[in-house]
Amino acid sequence: MLYLCGGKILRVKRILDIIKDWMLPIAIVLGIVSYLILHFIPVLHENVEPWFSVFAKDVQPVFVATMLFLQFNKISPHDLKIKRWHFALLAFQLVSFAAMALLAAGLPEGDWKILAESAMLCFVCPTAAAAGVITDKLGGSLSDTVTYVVMINVAATIFIPLAIPVVKDTGDMTFIQYVLAISKRIFPLLVLPLLLAWAIRYGWRKLQRKLMRYTHWAFYFWGISLCLSIYLATRATVTSGISLWIGIAIAAISLAACMLQFWFGHHVAGSGSRSDSITAGQALGQKNSGFLIWVGYSFLTPVTSVAGGLYSIWQNLVNSLELFQAKKHKTA
């Protein structure tokens, strides 16, 4: 009897290990396929897709916030230290963003302006809050990732409101209104889990020690969040109504921006440790694609939101490759 129970436990463990190893590609495929099924089967498109899309949009940030809370339990405020490569990444994002914004501002309304706006968004978009999960698995520094997540989110909150009125006629919205709109989108997801984790760390150490046992659950919350994110990204792309050539052009621009930022991040910190190279690559390459989609749809030409959906797919394909290479290197 014990032998049978032990065999079942081993089988379950093997299944969980397989899911863990293949979580990222599983989430990508499941997110894409699930939306396409709901979109192209008429009865599901009418009765299921509308409410499930609203559900996915509402619940996805909850999974991200829970994941961040579990991760932040591992980090002390003293662990957040700014390094030189943090400033290099910040300068790269802001200079690239400014260059694309000036280009977009000088172009008339039309396809070329859409492409410039798409590139602009791909460069300024803040680091994904979930970047620490992959960074941690690859052997990078979670605390250094969180440091840059905070830095770029603060910078984006200031610089995006400065650039948008230059690129697009935005009516009566003021700088402060832009800042407040973006802050409401960013900070509840990032700041509240951080403050809660640190409040527990310094006010309820016994609970904090118990929560430390469950920090590995952050990976599974990330997997669910990623699946929903890919679902929403696929929906934004399919329902955009863009022409074929614009779709291909935005795909090419978002892919180029993705590869360039992963490459620059890895190389700008290459003179440091391997951990720094991994961390900088993830900090610059991984983007909060949901935020990118929202800014494009809300303040710029709406079809630029497609860049966010496509960037999400590219960055997760890069992450899949990096995780595969890391596992291969580990077993070699």
How would you name each of these model-derived features?
Residues L2-A332:
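Alpha-helical transmembrane segments of multi-pass small-molecule/ion transporters
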